[in-house]
Amino acid sequence: MDYLDLGPYSSASGTVRLPGSKSISNRVLLLAALAEGDTTITNLLDSDDTRVMLDALGKLGVKLARDGDTCVVTGTRGAFTAKTADLFLGNAGTAVRPLTAALAINGGDYRVHGVPRMHERPIGDLVDGLRQIGAQIDYEQNEGFPPLRIKPGTISVDAPIRVRGDVSSQFLTALLMTLPLVKAKDGRTVVEIDGELISKPYIDITIRLMERFGVTVERDGWQRFVVPAGVRYRSPGRIMVEGDASSASYFLAAGALGGGPLRVEGVGRASIQGDVGFANALMQMGANVSMGDDWIEVRGIGHDHGKLDPIDMDFNLIPDAAMTIAVAALFASGTSTLRNIASWRVKETDRIAAMATELRKVGAIVEEGADYLVVTPPQRLTPNAAIDTYDDHRMAMCFSLVSLGGVPVRINDPKCVGKTFPDYFNRFAALAKA
């Protein structure tokens, strides 16, 4: 197995320019593909997840012209030209879920599949929602999970669509992005949410990006969404992908643990991503944080004893960045509790179980529940722990922070960061100092 040894490091400082946001990149690629006109996308993330989306769009007949982190997408005016395709989408939820919805109304015969873990990640609630409007979708293996076979259906909307919101916000994102292309009797389609909607900031990203392409979604709280029906997305001409706020969390934490000053560029007050809220969580833990419209800077911890304050917080709104808090909790002066993180169970791996296992390797006492994690830091971190990453990019990036505790750490399968941030470890090493 490949591995990477890091540290021991005693400080971290400098400036890092963030790669484009994964969540925004794949949404914008699909919206541009469905729109009328050409869209020039800049600062597009180059990663495993965006590559599978680009490959799929190409197979569906979308004209793409790439040059570095810029991509010109020629829109299809709402209908993919390829009526048959076999689409491998890796472990990219941001590709599988929205593409499934778009393909379901396209009148073709498609197969959607991915890596084995993707075939363990639920999609049944989205399929149920699409079947309510006449989509023909079959499960090839296990009910409720990919791989999927999508066939031509008789698509019509004559009642509100109901979808669960408590498993993944990507189901709602997929419906919202596709439904404007479907005609409805009164010119609008209503989507109603069963249960509590998780990861609300990701829905906000979806709605804001749809607005950039000329379609406005109305919402009544977070339980009812009204989408204009039978309309066409219009290209905004140019759109820039802002930096990835989830990726920012590792560097911001490094600035707290390693003294800083450490500045990330590409996200800030003006960001549409909820994960900029990670900076607020760090402040609650005692970090010195300042922020501009497109930058955030951390300058160590505001305590003489040099430890973070423990935190007890609901992380429903920022589940991905919450993983970084779990590792930062190793550097706190007491026990931290991360609540409302049930969505971790159905991510790239079961992140609650994986995080608990690996935190224990570095000496923490960890209690895990169905939707929470309690982390009590050790007096001293265990050196030379070999961290398993479970083919999960965020596990690898989070545990790099252990090296800032003055102990070496080994990261197994470090290349898994290719999912969202192929150059992460080079960037981290440029900022961390012995």
Swiss-Prot record:
Keywords: Amino-acid biosynthesis, Aromatic amino acid biosynthesis, Cytoplasm, Transferase. It catalyses: 3-phosphoshikimate + phosphoenolpyruvate = 5-O-(1-carboxyvinyl)-3-phosphoshikimate + phosphate. It is found in: Cytoplasm. Its EC number is 2.5.1.19. CDD domains: EPSP_synthase. GO terms for molecular function: 3-phosphoshikimate 1-carboxyvinyltransferase activity. The active site is at 320 (proton acceptor). Pathway: Metabolic intermediate biosynthesis; chorismate biosynthesis; chorismate from D-erythrose 4-phosphate and phosphoenolpyruvate: step 6/7. GO terms for biological process: amino acid biosynthetic process; aromatic amino acid family biosynthetic process; chorismate biosynthetic process. 3-phosphoshikimate binds at residues 22-23, 27, 168-170, 199, 320, 347. Its main location: cytoplasm. The keyword Transport does not apply. Phosphoenolpyruvate binds at residues 22, 93, 121, 170, 351, 394, 419. The keyword Transport does not apply. GO terms for cellular component: cytoplasm. PROSITE patterns: EPSP_SYNTHASE_1, EPSP_SYNTHASE_2. NCBIfam families: aroA. Belongs to the EPSP synthase family. Monomer. PANTHER family: AROM/DEHYDROQUINATE SYNTHASE, PENTAFUNCTIONAL AROM POLYPEPTIDE. Catalyzes the transfer of the enolpyruvyl moiety of phosphoenolpyruvate (PEP) to the 5-hydroxyl of shikimate-3-phosphate (S3P) to produce enolpyruvyl shikimate-3-phosphate and inorganic phosphate. This is 3-phosphoshikimate 1-carboxyvinyltransferase. It comes from Burkholderia ambifaria (strain ATCC BAA-244 / DSM 16087 / CCUG 44356 / LMG 19182 / AMMD).
